[in-house]
Curated annotation (Swiss-Prot):
A GO term for molecular function: chemoattractant activity
InterPro entries in UniProt: Defensin_beta-like (IPR001855)
Gene behind this protein: GAL2
Family annotation (Pfam families): Defensin_beta (PF00711)
GO terms for biological process, alphabetical: cell chemotaxis; defense response; defense response to bacterium
Main function: Potent antibacterial activity against the Gram-negative bacterium E.coli ML-35, and against the Gram-positive bacterium L.monocytogenes EGD. Lacks antifungal activity against C.albicans.
Main location: secreted
Source organism: Gallus gallus
Similarity comment: family membership: Belongs to the beta-defensin family.
Tissue specificity note: Expressed in circulating heterophil granulocytes and bone marrow (at protein level). Strong expression in the bone marrow, lung and testis. Moderate expression in the bursa and intestine. Low expression in the cloaca, gall bladder, brain, pancreas, trachea, air sacs and spleen. Expressed in the vagina, ovarian stroma and the theca layer of the ovarian follicle, but not in the granulosa layer of the ovarian follicle.
Highest taxon of the lineage: Eukaryota
UniProt-recorded name of the protein: Gallinacin-2
Length: 64
């Protein structure tokens, strides 16, 4: 029965980190004016930091 609690807590943690369920406002707070992208940045943007989870904070080169 204790392992069931552990599985539910891990599932809850995984759902919080997933990109579709996180708050866009919280991501923008971490990014500070850039845009958050899952994984790496597109080729025309540069990485300036990280957003919540596995996202990269990307900005235009002339705004960085």
């Amino acid at each position: 029965m204790r392992i069931l609690y552990l599985l539910f807590s891990l599932l809850f943690l995984a759902l919080q980190v997933s990109p579709g369920l996180s708050s866009p406002r919280r991501d923008m707070l971490f990014c500070k004016g850039g845009s958050c992208h899952f994984g790496g940045c597109p080729s025309h943007l540069i990485k300036v930091g990280s957003c919540f989870g596995f996202r990269s904070c990307c900005k235009w080169p002339w705004n960085a």
